[in-house]
């Protein structure tokens, strides 16, 4: 049996661009893309913390060090500039792989620089 598990995420990135007439995708600063382990053209889910919208598109590389998070094409309707988003990719693992795999978690500052990285999501407490 294959399990669909979190592969990586960019947590609390901010939308810097929305390009309605650009070919659909999400442009992600190349440094963030690499650090998270995202691949160009990889399917990503985006969760807009600001407005609650959730949608899927694919990742493309934006200029490294630019801090760009650009929602392109139809995805541009899903957020306003400055909205906080979580960008996730998932992968299929067999049960053995799933028991040892640790996702790459990248936590972003307000300017989309790296605040922290981790491989474990803390236990939620009351």
Curated annotation (Swiss-Prot):
Keywords: Autocatalytic cleavage, Cytoplasm, Decarboxylase, Lyase, Pantothenate biosynthesis, Pyruvate, Schiff base, Zymogen
Modified residues (Pyruvic acid (Ser)): 25
Catalytic activity: L-aspartate + H(+) = beta-alanine + CO2
Cofactor: pyruvate
Functional pathway: Cofactor biosynthesis; (R)-pantothenate biosynthesis; beta-alanine from L-aspartate: step 1/1
Subcellular location: Cytoplasm
Residues at the catalytic site: 25 (schiff-base intermediate with substrate), 58 (proton donor)
Domain of life of the organism encoding this protein: Bacteria
Entry comment on modification after translation: Is synthesized initially as an inactive proenzyme, which is activated by self-cleavage at a specific serine bond to produce a beta-subunit with a hydroxyl group at its C-terminus and an alpha-subunit with a pyruvoyl group at its N-terminus.
One cellular component (GO) term of this entry: cytosol
Comment on bound cofactor: Binds 1 pyruvoyl group covalently per subunit.
GO terms, biological process: alanine biosynthetic process; pantothenate biosynthetic process
Binding-site list for substrate: 57, 73-75
UniProt entry tagged with the keyword Cytoplasm: yes
EC number: 4.1.1.11
Gene3D superfamilies: 2.40.40.20
Chief localization: cytoplasm
Biological role stated in the UniProt entry: Catalyzes the pyruvoyl-dependent decarboxylation of aspartate to produce beta-alanine.
Protein family per UniProt: Belongs to the PanD family.
Subunit structure: Heterooctamer of four alpha and four beta subunits.
Record-linked NCBIfam families: panD (TIGR00223)
Family matches, as PANTHER family: ASPARTATE 1-DECARBOXYLASE (PTHR21012:SF0)
Protein name: Aspartate 1-decarboxylase
Organism for this UniProt entry: Psychrobacter arcticus (strain DSM 17307 / VKM B-2377 / 273-4)
């Amino acid at each position: 049996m294959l399990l669909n598990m979190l592969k990586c995420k960019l947590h609390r990135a901010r939308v810097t661009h929305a390009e309605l007439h650009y070919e659909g995708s999400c442009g992600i600063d190349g440094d963030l893309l690499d650090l998270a382990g995202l691949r160009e053209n990889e399917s990503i889910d985006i969760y807009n913390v600001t407005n609650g919208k959730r949608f899927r598109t694919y990742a493309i590389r934006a200029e490294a060090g630019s801090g760009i998070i650009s929602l392109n094409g139809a995805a541009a309707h899903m957020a306003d500039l400055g909205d906080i988003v979580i960008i996730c990719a998932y992968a299929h693992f067999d049960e053995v792989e799933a028991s040892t795999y640790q996702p790459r978690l990248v936590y972003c500052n307000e300017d989309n620089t790296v605040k922290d990285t981790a491989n474990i999501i803390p236990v939620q407490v009351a």
